[in-house]
Amino acid sequence: MIILDGKKVASRRKEELTAKISKYHNKGLRKPKLVVIMVGNDPASEVYVSHKIKVANEVGIYSELLRFDKDIKKEELYNKINELNNDQNIDGILLQLPLPIDFIEEDYLQAITPSKDVDGFHYINQGKMLQGYDTVYPCTPLGIINLLEEYNISVKNKDITLIGTSNIVGKPLGMMLLNNQATITMCNKNTKNIKNHTINADIIISATGKQFIITEDMIKKDAVIIDVGIIRDPVTNKLVGDVDFEKVKLKSSYITPVPGGVGPMTVITLMENTFVLYEKHINKSK
């Protein structure tokens, strides 16, 4: 069994990205700029945002956090996004989710111009992804693809079971895997007997946020296991995932830990996406 060490891979990619950004900056060009919008004070979002900004600063991306009270008028938030869209010195705009309950998240995600949609959630970028065109890909799905590639795990002709069909992870990841010639089975909350769909899978990717939904009896020997879930165990207070790691690892060939697997790959992919958009903006302005 080999641990898919997202923390280690992300650290190396971080060094590579820092070097790429330095080359532009040494030529006298501006640094890439990422703006993060946060509405309200969700505790988990506070942690995620502070980490994203920390990593951005470490690789040489200028980051700005715009905080808004949960009672901000919806029109005011739209206007701010539009203002950022028109700022030529901004390369990426990230809307930290979740928004307060009375905000329709999709409306604000679609308000971000596709050329600054660092999360790859705009319907134009999603449509390009669907058709297999070059575009900005959602961070967690692309991070997973990159992690598999780092360990020379091909998805071509593999039977892959994906559990969880969110717009952020499951749906885009399923499409990206299809575009890479994998055979995909997608399970949602209404799927009966998930084990029937996982037991013969070469690769299992679980993104439900439900603790230990994947157990050792549900996988075949030497399966590859990707755990996207992250939950705090109410008993031990430790972070765990969808997968019963200690037991499943004994049967799998490769497996991601929680934490230290998919999470670090998501963050570095966000930075890489910001750099991709930055390069496009810089080249366009020449």
Swiss-Prot record:
Q: Does the keyword Secreted apply?
A: no
User: Which CDD domains does this one have?
Assistant: NAD_bind_m-THF_DH_Cyclohyd (cd01080)
Disulfide bridges in this chain: none
Q: Does the keyword Repeat apply?
A: no
HAMAP family linked to this entry: THF_DHG_CYH
Q: Which family is this sequence assigned to?
A: Belongs to the tetrahydrofolate dehydrogenase/cyclohydrolase family.
Name it: Bifunctional protein FolD
Q: Name the gene.
A: folD
